[in-house]
Amino acid sequence: MGRYASVIKFYALTVLKWQTVSIAAVLAFNVLLSVLVPAFTSISDPHVTIGSTDVVALVWVLAIGAILTPYGFRFLLYHGVSRSTQFTAMCLTLAALSAAWAVIVMAFISANLVFARTSVLYQLLYNRADVLGTITWEFAAFLLLAFVGWFTYLVLRVTGRNAKIALIAAPFMLGPILGLLNMATDGALLRAVGRAVVAAMGLSSSVPNPYVGVLSMLVLALAFGAAIRPILLRVQVRES
């Protein structure tokens, strides 16, 4: 475990300054909402909410999965840290980072009860604000996005120029293609996809269950992790 601890510490020191900047950005966003929300909503209505305070954190965690991967990869290899050890250490680092951000988001939720009537995606989706559910769901969402960022970076690094262009263009091409397929099936395609997503996130029953969504996101994160490992073990050092 000592070999993992040293690599995690290496990553943690790297993330610390980025983490500080990100927390400052989220804090500034919340302070701004604290001023704007009372100005544009009826103070007499305690149930009115505007915006989601965890969007900045979600985007940042998605980016950090890609940022941490190239940082120090060649340096750690040079100092005898194997790719397998780096993979495990990175997984543990992202898990710890996701847990920390879940707690930070919960702290902002508590502060917003006093300063601004805002909410987070968990509250908007499940219409509840329990501490355990919020932290667990946010942790799973952060972890999934971190692995998505990590996977995306590695795929772009190991593919050629034409493949990179195709991957970048794919999201813009996918929309029209899905639209045509949906028209061909009289809307059945998107309805089926929508039902699958709703069920996977635990929203299909009369009482939404966030822990179904947590399980789905964790399983998906594990799937990305399983896809990441063989890529990381084979990626060329000169590309890092």
Segments predicted by a language model, with ranges:
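Long, hydrophobic alpha-helical segments
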Residues: T49-Y71
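Hydrophobic alpha-helical transmembrane segments of multi-pass membrane transport/permease proteins
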Residues: W18-P38, A57-I64, L167-L181
